[in-house]
Amino acid sequence: MTIILHPGSVLLRDLATIYWTGVPARLDPSFDAGIVKAADRIAEIAAGNAPVYGINTGFGKLASIKIDSADVAALQRNLVLSHCCGVGEALPENVVRLMMALKLVSLGRGASGVRLELVRLIEAMLARGVIPVIPEKGSVGASGDLAPLAHMAAVMMGHGEAFFGGERLNGATALLKAGLQPVELAAKEGLALINGTQTSTALALAGLFRAHRAAQSALITGAMSTDAAMGSSAPFHPEIHTLRGHRGQIDTAEALRALLENSPIRQSHIEGDERVQDPYCIRCQPQVDGACLDLLRSVARTLEIEANAVTDNPLVLSDNSVVAGGNFHAEPVAFAADQIVLAICEIGAIAQRRIALLVDPALSYGLPAFLAKKPGLNSGLMIAEVTSAALMSENKQMSHPASVDSTPTSANQEDHVSMACHGARRLLPMTENLFAIIGIEALCAAQGVELRAPLATSPELTKAIAAIRNVVPSLEEDRYMANDLKAATVLIASGSLNESVSSGILPALEV
């Protein structure tokens, strides 16, 4: 399977498929003519004497220096290699694959002026599994993601490092083993490759896809916690939510109702329950998780636009003029990443409060302390709850907005930057923490429901508990817990818990 990209109209679902599965991507051939036309225009300028930024001039603060036409190729080579200044660990390969696909989309719009040869090489690298090693740190998100994308371009030139066949190799060797040849860059091509927001956008999209998967799982575990605590489903009544009108809240309440439908536990306490209202972590799930869903959907629209954007500089416009601008500034991506952070924190915060409720006999309506079958002799899920609190707090500490932390760079020529790249990169560890929090809630909620026997939960939640028990058995007595938490985290991160319930129940990202 190969994803066929139509620059300008690429859909989030296709980008999600590239991220989750690693499937290759290539441009629809109908875009070749536009790419060639822009490349011809750049070649025409490079052969002339008029100075045009990025083609026959220096870069950044050095833009006023005219470069001789004989040195145009060397200019691009020097640009790429000098900008390979990334530090830190390598970005995950699935993020880099997505980044490369996004670069294809940008180049495919026919405004960058690169030869078709470069596009074909990126496509071939994706198809054959030559994935550049991209150090995770070094971009301030304007002028684009220079350092990370330079590491990609370097591999295309036979420099740098790449993953291929499970090995980390130098770029030239990786290309050779894949049956590919390095490219010699022509006018503007180095700049077109490294000047763009594709690294930040790939990281933000990865964070978005992961946060949405976690949000869906949190509806399952939240519904399960509701039944485990013998909470009321009355606050999920549809009219309550239509009276407020927020789509995410309405969709979340609908999902909770579907998950809890026909629960014998719920039926057992509809009448005669002395409790008037549940705590907010049970009762206000539609309001909190629904607001998070609305936020993620809003961010999804922003990132879908950015994924289809041309973000290098200068650009070949429709009248064949070449004009310098600032599309490389990743402020929209930085804002999007900062918003995703809010959803991650809040989904985790309310889930953690449900965990705390379930392990507290003063709040759990008859469940044993820490969900242990013999409390005292056994500590049960006591420290699992503490771990969830630690992860929740760690996420809060990472939630400071990155976009407000601009600093001048490059001799004050690039005097306002977005910080989008590390703002988006933190979404990966934050969502990993969130997967673990929701995994812990899954263990607690499943244990709580089982302790209500002989009463059973709903058919949908019964299927979800079966998925949990497929990887973690019931807690009969204290045991080594780290493996249980790891397995539960993987269950959430892989999407397996979401797949256990009927299709169509969990709200989609795209509406």
UniProtKB/Swiss-Prot annotation:
One of its GO terms (cellular component) is cytoplasm. Gene3D superfamilies: Fumarase/aspartase (Central domain), Fumarase/aspartase (N-terminal domain). It is found in: Cytoplasm. Contains an active site 4-methylidene-imidazol-5-one (MIO), which is formed autocatalytically by cyclization and dehydration of residues Ala-Ser-Gly. Its main location: cytoplasm. GO terms for molecular function: histidine ammonia-lyase activity. Pfam families: Lyase_aromatic. GO terms for biological process: L-histidine catabolic process to glutamate and formamide; L-histidine catabolic process to glutamate and formate. The modification 2,3-didehydroalanine (Ser) is found at residue 143. Keywords: Cytoplasm, Histidine metabolism, Lyase. There is a cross-link at residues 142-144 (5-imidazolinone (Ala-Gly)). Its EC number is 4.3.1.3. It comes from the Bacteria. It is an enzyme of class 4 (lyase). CDD domains: PAL-HAL. It catalyses: L-histidine = trans-urocanate + NH4(+). Pathway: Amino-acid degradation; L-histidine degradation into L-glutamate; N-formimidoyl-L-glutamate from L-histidine: step 1/3. Belongs to the PAL/histidase family. This is Histidine ammonia-lyase. It comes from Chelativorans sp. (strain BNC1).
